[in-house]
Amino acid sequence: MTKESVESYKKIFKKFLSFEDGKILELMDLDNDFFVDFIVFLREEYKLSDNTLYRQMNFFKTFLNWCNTKSMQTNKDYKKVKLNKYNPDTISLTKEDLKVLENLELSKSKSYHRDLFLIGCYSGQRFSDYSVFERSDVQGNMIIKRSEKTESHSFIPLIPQLKSLLDKHDWNLTIISGQKFNDYLKIICQKAGFDEEVKTTKYMGSKKTVEIKKRWEIITSHTARRTFITIASENLMPDHIIMKITGIQDPKTLQRYKKVNKEKVMDYALNVFS
């Protein structure tokens, strides 16, 4: 189990204890009425969006599935809980953006976090995987890495940009929390001038909220993986190769990662109709 997964379990159970408010509940008490009230509580008390609620309730349901494997009696109503999930407003960076980041003058600490993000952009891995690369993972000109989340093996080409970054830090990458990393990343991307306005949509039950944010505000550690996949796809790398590098096993999942920027749309249109 990844460190991020452990933190996610802690978050939902902290909210559960807050909802429980000292009451003693048994697993059989977690019926449909409980889940209706719990979901309302999470929306009203914590202002969770539908996507965040979907993720956190999945962790809660996974825990109940685990209880079943241990022969504990659970109320099976939890299996009927259905929540909406929407495609999130996400972005990817361009090769030009990566050059801007590479040439940015930063303090030692911010420089490290910038490099760590670029390692993700050039490897296509999840943060939990690209933040723990080791020399022992190298075979020839490949990094062979087993994903912490899926336990599948990825074959990651040790391209010059990636090798240079890893060598720069002597392959000694300090492990930090994803949230702390994201905080640093937003500061770095703001300094890089990623100020273009982006429309974001959040769903909370029947309420739809549209916000205008700066591009740097919605860049996270996961943007690195999405950036690799998008750039690889735009440069005609076959999907099955992208999947082998990233460890993605479902083609539908791969499609959700692909983002097309407006410049590429214009380029293709001009090439077709000029």
Question: Which residues make up each language-model segment?
Answer:
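Short, charged phosphate-coordinating catalytic segments
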Residues: N65-T74, L118-G140
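A short, basic/aromatic helix-end/turn motif that makes direct DNA contacts
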Residues: V132-V138, S233-N235, M243-Q249, Y257-V260
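Basic, Lys/Arg- and aromatic-enriched nucleic-acid-binding interface segment
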Residues: D50, Y54, Q73, Y78-F127, ...
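N-terminal core-binding DNA-recognition domain of tyrosine recombinases/integrases
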Residues: M1-E4, F13-D89, N103-L104
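Short, basic (Lys/Arg/His-rich) helix/loop patches that form interaction surfaces
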Residues: W171-N172, K186-K244
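C-terminal secondary-structure termini that scaffold catalytic or DNA-interacting sites
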Residues: W171, I175, D183, F194, ...
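Catalytic-site neighborhood detector that most strongly recognizes the C-terminal catalytic loop/helix
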Residues: S147-E151, T246-N271
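Conserved tyrosine-mediated DNA breakage-rejoining catalytic core shared by Y-recombinases
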Residues: P88, S123, V132-L165
